[in-house]
Amino acid sequence: MAAPRSWALWSFCGCGWSRAVSGCRLPGLRSSSPRGPLGARLLSQEKEATETHFGFETVSEEEKGGKVYQVFESVAKKYDVMNDMMSLGIHRVWKDLLLWKMRPFPGTQLLDVAGGTGDIAFRFLNYVQAQHQRKQKRQLRAQQNLSWEEIARKYQNEEDSLGGSHVMVCDINKEMLKIGKQKARAQGYKAGLAWILGDAEELPFDDNKFDVYTIAFGIRNVTHIDQALQEAHRVLKPGGRFLCLEFSQVNNPLLSRLYDVYSFQVIPVLGEVIAGDWKSYQYLVESIRQFPSQEEFKEMIEDAGFQKVTYENLTSGIVAIHSGFKLYLR
């Protein structure tokens, strides 16, 4: 999700939020260094003000960041409920398909950007844990002489149950991250999971750090999509994979007309009734219409340096999963 370009980096370390300072930062975090291989970039306040879109409204780039932040700050508490209502629960299937397409291997280091409420992170942890448990069972069957105590020890180690896999959830909105942490606590997710407040356009991570980068229903809210894609490329290891789940352009004319009616006449009403917020959901609908087509977004991903870029339409193109690989050092 886009937001003002000046922000304080915070980390969640078990007890609460703490400002990350020099000499006290999570492994792999950058200490406000230059852009590296992407080249030095000026701070936002030094940039010439340019215009962009906020839904169908034309605003300055700086203004858009603030407006998008306010939208997600406003909808955070009802975000998951509204996702279920707006999509009739189908968003859960789309996210499951994203994980199926990812098929993470043991030890996968995942960065989930704009993933504040944890939907992708929790699915990832469930997937790798199930995968590791299947591997353990095969090993146990091959070692018939193990005692019950040895078997119990193998299953009691929660960190080991993930096979070394880890997910870092990065979001620019503190309220969204707050909801995600509450869900993690309620559902018992602890191991292999960390939360970082950060901007998709200026990720606070070292180069070549992650195996997979995911962003689900977030990149259309970024002010500079090209910069977010370049950052995704930077933080991925050579051989790493970019996966984006995002609303796209419907490829069925009849469904497209029905979808427009539902989007503009029903979703904002649901937003008002359930979340008490018509304007935020009006923006979300408009932002979908402003997002590039499947082919245009594919070209943007390729321009950022990714190779073997493909996309798959889901539900007649209402959403699409774009995939690309970082196959060389930049």
UniProtKB/Swiss-Prot annotation:
CDD domains: AdoMet_MTases. One of its GO terms (cellular component) is extrinsic component of mitochondrial inner membrane. Keywords: Membrane, Methyltransferase, Mitochondrion, Mitochondrion inner membrane, S-adenosyl-L-methionine, Transferase, Transit peptide, Ubiquinone biosynthesis. It comes from the Eukaryota. Pfam families: Ubie_methyltran. One of its GO terms (molecular function) is 2-methoxy-6-polyprenyl-1,4-benzoquinol methyltransferase activity. Pathway: Cofactor biosynthesis; ubiquinone biosynthesis. It catalyses: 2-methoxy-6-(all-trans-decaprenyl)benzene-1,4-diol + S-adenosyl-L-methionine = 5-methoxy-2-methyl-3-(all-trans-decaprenyl)benzene-1,4-diol + S-adenosyl-L-homocysteine + H(+). S-adenosyl-L-methionine binds at T117, D171, D199, A200. InterPro entries: SAM-dependent_MTases_sf, UbiE/COQ5_MeTrFase, UbiE/COQ5_MeTrFase_CS. Its EC number is 2.1.1.201. It is found in: Mitochondrion inner membrane. The keyword S-adenosyl-L-methionine applies. SUPFAM superfamilies: S-adenosyl-L-methionine-dependent methyltransferases. It is a peripheral membrane protein. Methyltransferase required for the conversion of 2-decaprenyl-6-methoxy-1,4-benzoquinol (DDMQH2) to 2-decaprenyl-3-methyl-6-methoxy-1,4-benzoquinol (DMQH2). This is 2-methoxy-6-polyprenyl-1,4-benzoquinol methylase, mitochondrial. It comes from Bos taurus.
